Amino acid sequence: MGAPAPVLPPLATLGAGSAAAFAQKPVAPSLPSVGEELTLERGGKATVLAQEGDPGAAAFRVKTVERELLLRWRATPAPASRETLQRAAREGMPHGALLWPVDLATSSKAAGFGCLSPLPSPSFLPLASLLAGAPSPLRPRVTAALHLAEATLALHAAGWHLRGLSLKDVFFDPSGGEARLAGWDRILGIVEGTGSGELLAPEARGGQKVEGPYADLHALAVLQFCLIYQHFPFAGRKALGLPAGEAALDQLAASPVFLFDPARRENEAVPLAQDATGRAGGRAIALWESTLGDVKSLFSQAFGDGLRNPPGRPGASSWRLALGKLRDALYPCAHCTTDNVYDLVALKARGGAPGGCIHCGRELVLPARMKVGKHVLVLPAGSKIYRHHVEIGRSIGSDAVAEVSCHPQKPEILGIKNVSGQTWSIQWPDGKLLPLEPGKTIKLENGLKIQFGQQEGEVRR
């Protein structure tokens, strides 16, 4: 047996000098305090304004010279985590939708360090609230879904993954349609965790750690469906037997059956006439039936074979392409303003009849359209023409070159504004040629042609 551990004498038995020295070594606090000034690693100071979240949480709102930021404090960090965060802040955010580390901060009082990242604007809502809230305009939701696809592509290109996320980590602007993605500590692997069950891929359940893009693509597909249809993809008839809340979503995702899977009717969407609450997908039925075939095919693939075969899941680039087309096809009902989908295939099948609104059921009024190369764009007020429409070979994105708006005194008249920074040549239906300079607006008329440079667009009304 080894020698017994030495017993330290009580503080009172130590010599006066030793006792004073021992007592004068205060333990460093684990968190900074409100009002404290922190030192930023990349230069400058940040003042702690308030604590964020639950009492005791290591999250604070801080203010630098330029703006307010979110600070997450790590009192006992692993050495590698600091290097990872320094790299992330140095390289910058891979995509504007990511609430990404921008700097590190230290305290003269508290142990450890903190990481600063942007705060979502107050106009942004958590995606979780969208599922439980009132119907929201479709165009911003589709735009937010497109941004998430772009952000996922950028993350993968930078070597990161959507690890451990939940619906609470996703925010969107219900008016403009931008998306924000939090959870950088899990994306960067600083904090371990599988996230909440509603986004967890089937193969990652049971505590199994799954690396690579396939689990990301399952989470991305779930987020896309939640945004576009304002509903959880596995909440069909089975949801009626469960209490409302996050626990129900987790349970449904544990044994996922897509509510629009034609081969699995046990969890089919239930019409509102049979379930007025809409918990079983009733509000999503009309929009699903009118959605472009490309988008429906991706969801059917992701929540069909993709549930059993991870490599068979649609990639983020496929989502970006399909959602870009869906955004181009949206226009509001003239009666209730609900966004509907312009589907040329369905229009031809109806013999050119526009069909009824997915919300009010009244006959739709077809919007102005523009054919640009292979694209057919609908041009309601508020729509945009993007750079990828007019520049051959450019990837789908959100860089607008033209905006459509109503005449301020005559809302029935639409105009198209050049926001590209380049002068375009336009041709009126009578053949007259004129320049359209940046910042100028011209009336949308049937037969109007615009030479964008590489592509020509023609208006059809």
Where are these regions (language model features)?
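Catalytic-loop of the protein kinase fold
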Residues: T152, H156-P174
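C-terminal boundary/linker segments immediately following FHA domains
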Residues: Q427-R461
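Conserved activation segment of eukaryotic-like protein kinases, specifically the C-terminal portion
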Residues: I190-G207
